[in-house]
Amino acid sequence: MKNLRLKAARAALDMSQQQLADAVGVSRQTINAIEKGDYNPTIKLCVSICRRLGKTLDELFWEG
């Protein structure tokens, strides 16, 4: 399932996939795969992404 919330949060900060990837220590391809729903990130990576984007885990990753 695509993660449109992650993509929207990143775009709202005018941040590229590469900028987010650099900030959390992964490749741009990893961020792309997460946004496309092709990769299930570790909880550690989820937390890093949330901190960088100023969002909670619930806001970006959990269905509900």
Model-predicted segments: where are they?
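Residues in the helix-turn-helix
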Residues: 19, 30, 59
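Recognition helix of helix-turn-helix/homeodomain-like DNA-binding domains
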Residues: 26-39
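Absolute protein N-terminus
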Residues: 1-3, 64
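DNA major-groove recognition helix of helix-turn-helix/homeodomain DNA-binding modules
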Residues: 44-59
